[in-house]
Amino acid sequence: MKGLLYLALAIVSEVFGSTMLKLSEGFTQAWPIGGVIAGFLSAFTFLSFSLKTIDLSSAYATWSGVGTALTAIVGFLLFGETISLKGVFGLTLVIAGVVVLNQSKAPAKEKKQTVCE
């Protein structure tokens, strides 16, 4: 269960870092750069924690797929970016792929907890 929480935090952190990257305007705006660093550092830290209990293939596919979809939604909602019908279809395929990948996995044995948890 902790693995899923860490994975969710990794996704949120990655989307935050990507949003700050957009706001940095190619690293020409100083204040968002701290958000970029904090967001991506947190994302990889939480992703590494999630890998203690979640298979790499599932965790990484979920992190990148859901992160991609949420980043596109943030771009649409906050920055007025457009998403074409083909784009919506593509994002739907990404999410469907993540779901199918995760559903096709055999139930994993619970991995031993470590001191860090």
Curated annotation (Swiss-Prot):
Its main location: membrane. GO terms for cellular component: plasma membrane. Keywords: Cell membrane, Membrane, Transmembrane, Transmembrane helix, Transport. The chain crosses the membrane at residues 3-23, 31-51, 59-79, 81-101. It is found in: Cell membrane. It is a multi-pass membrane protein. Signal peptide: none annotated. GO terms for molecular function: transmembrane transporter activity. Gene3D superfamilies: 1.10.3730.20. Belongs to the drug/metabolite transporter (DMT) superfamily. Small multidrug resistance (SMR) (TC 2.A.7.1) family. EbrA/EbrB subfamily. Part of a multidrug efflux pump. Confers resistance to cationic lipophilic dyes such as ethidium bromide, acriflavine, pyronine Y and safranin O. The efflux is probably coupled to an influx of protons. The efflux pump is composed of EbrA and EbrB. This is Multidrug resistance protein EbrB. The gene is ebrB.
